[in-house]
Amino acid sequence: MPKMKTNRSAAKRFRITKNGKIMRNHAYRSHKTGKKRRNTLRELRKKDVVSSTDKYRILRLLGKK
């Protein structure tokens, strides 16, 4: 059976850590940031861990499962 292709859009959005967590960027940061608080924008800069319910689906998109 051939290898499963990696979904390229998912590969650009998600990173897998050494511990197996999947990290993602926050939304709501690309434009219209003038009305958002500075603290909010700073928090949105950080990475976030993908929830366990979505983890298996993303791993399949990345060709890891």
UniProtKB/Swiss-Prot annotation:
Q: Show the HAMAP family listed in the entry.
A: Ribosomal_bL35
Concerning InterPro entries, the annotation shows:
Ribosomal_bL35, Ribosomal_bL35-like, Ribosomal_bL35_CS, Ribosomal_bL35_sf
Q: PROSITE patterns, alphabetically?
A: RIBOSOMAL_L35
Name of this protein: Large ribosomal subunit protein bL35
Alphabetical keyword list: Ribonucleoprotein, Ribosomal protein
Q: Which PANTHER family match?
A: 54S RIBOSOMAL PROTEIN BL35M, LARGE RIBOSOMAL SUBUNIT PROTEIN BL35M
Q: Which family does it belong to?
A: Belongs to the bacterial ribosomal protein bL35 family.
Output a single Gene Ontology CC term carried by this record.
cytosolic large ribosomal subunit
